[in-house]
């Protein structure tokens, strides 16, 4: 009983993260309201990204409500919608700097909430949060470190690293013991290399 109560209390850590995320995305939309798309409207692609955001917030639900298989289904739906919003941006001419940032920050929140779940509900150590915090640490580094340039655009390697990270984190959700942990570790190493590469090219851009 004490262990269950402790887990329940720990899980409340996910809700402040989700609430802060909602507020930060509201600020992002407000600041970027004049440049959603080249036409000025919010756009189909951004609407799909907003749907992704609403779906992934469900990952902050307690494990008694959201089983690993439910979480896997949500992650799969969010990733499929990620493909759709990219297609919509190209098809409807909605591609914009705002849309790119909206998409990247939604991906970052997905990783953060998923790693929080692995830590709080699936028995992983706090080390698993490294992958979830990397994007935010990278942006903070760009702001604070003298001589860094603008954030480098997401490369093909970055997209592949994100996909492999998601596969690894999903392995952690549904595979037992060392199999799940191995997937998470490999995904974390790959995405760390991706951010290191982006940091290097950001330095070159100065």
Predicted regions mapped to residue ranges:
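Short hydrophobic alpha-helical segments within the ABC transporter permease transmembrane module
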Residues: 93, 101-105
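A feature for the membrane-embedded catalytic helix bundles of lipid/isoprenoid biosynthetic enzymes
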Residues: 1-42, 104-206
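Membrane-embedded alpha-helical segments that form the functional core of polytopic membrane enzymes
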Residues: 15-27, 41-96, 178-192
């Amino acid at each position: 009983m004490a262990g269950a109560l402790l887990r329940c209390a720990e899980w409340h850590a996910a809700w402040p993260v989700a609430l802060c995320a909602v507020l930060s995305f509201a600020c992002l939309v407000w600041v970027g309201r004049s440049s959603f798309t080249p036409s000025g409207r919010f756009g189909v692609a951004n609407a799909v990204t907003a749907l992704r955001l609403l779906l992934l917030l469900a990952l902050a639900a307690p494990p008694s409500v959201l089983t690993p298989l439910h979480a896997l289904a949500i992650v799969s739906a969010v990733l499929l919608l990620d493909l759709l919003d990219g297609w919509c941006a190209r098809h409807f001419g909605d591609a914009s700097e705002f849309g790119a940032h909206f998409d990247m920050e939604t991906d970052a929140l997905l990783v953060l909430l998923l790693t929080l779940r692995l830590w709080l509900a699936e028995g992983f150590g706090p080390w698993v949060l490294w992958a979830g915090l990397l994007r935010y640490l990278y942006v903070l580094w760009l702001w604070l470190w003298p001589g860094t340039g603008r954030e480098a655009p997401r490369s093909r390697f970055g997209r592949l690293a994100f996909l492999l990270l998601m596969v690894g984190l999903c392995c952690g959700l549904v595979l037992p013991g060392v199999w799940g942990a191995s997937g998470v570790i490999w995904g974390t190493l790959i995405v760390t290399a991706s951010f290191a590469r982006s940091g290097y090219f950001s330095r070159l851009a100065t």
